[in-house]
Amino acid sequence: MMLLDGREAPAEYERVKDLLGQFFATKTKAELLEAAMQRRLLITPITTTEEVVNSEQLAFRGYWETVEHFDGTKINYPGSFAKFGATPLKKLGAPPRLGEHTDEVLDQSERTPEVPIETVKVSNELPLKGVKILDLMWAMAGPAASRVLADYGAEIIRVESGNKIDAVRTLQPFPNDEADPDKSGIFNNMNAGKQGLSLDLSKPEAIDVIWDLIEWADVVLESFSPKAMSAWGIGYPQIAEKKPEIIMASSCLMGQTGPRAQVPGYGNMAAAIAG
């Protein structure tokens, strides 16, 4: 934003970038990552395939699933993309042999649906009409996902930080190339169809408002660093104790658990870590 509104010149950006490059060249990826975790800096390594396969974080999270093939070989495959509380995703099975299910498929020529097909009803109502969502996500990945739910008719109230601007508000394009946090094309695209308000969650009064919104909501979405919600007293265990029917999804760079869980970051940093 400082570059866009003229408070800093592009030459200053280039100067700082060169200085950072010189400094980073004296450090290893591991050293930079450890320092970033200690100082809460947005720095992540660009990993190799070997580093991904041997990732301590992915191993801790149980990401790899070992599948035994028909010839007896065992191979690790990427597992489920998320951890579900009550409905875990199905484990991977062995790949079928060529033609293994041909006869079985051919014998099911008159298969009927497991769920009876109802008479088609024409309606202008969107499928998620009536679903109420409290959106505590920020940046791009989370708000883009909840934007899809808004497109399908969900009623969404998005809460932003009252003391720290969402970084996406600083991104181009802007109308007439005039920087304005309320007019970022990317931000408004990600959050179309939602209602919004700003709260300072460090204040008890703001947490009271969040609880009112939780009582209203069917679904809670959040993308803070792990433990942040619990520190505010609004983590899943605390919410579920008062409202056991709540559906909650938490998203962060490295997952909610593990030795690297506290590493913060954006989507481009996830791409770097993924190799």
Question: What is each of the regions a protein language model found here?
Answer:
Residues 30, 68, 93, 97, ...:
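N-terminal helix-loop segment corresponding to the beta1-alpha1 unit
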Residues 10-13, 81-85, 123-126, 188-190:
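A short alpha-helix capping/helix-coil boundary motif
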Residues 17-27, 43-44, 91, 134-137, ...:
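Short, well-ordered beta-strand elements within core beta-sheets of diverse protein domains
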Residues 38-92:
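A glycine-rich dinucleotide-binding beta-alpha-beta segment and adjacent secondary-structure elements
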Residues 1-39, 43:
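Aromatic-enriched alpha-helical interface/lid elements that frame and gate functional surfaces
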Residues 7-11, 78, 94-97:
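Active-site loop of classical SDR/Rossmann-like NAD(P)-dependent oxidoreductases
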Residues 15, 85-88, 216-222:
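Short, surface-exposed connector motifs at secondary-structure boundaries
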Residues 1-8, 71-73, 116-118:
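Short, composition-biased local secondary-structure segments
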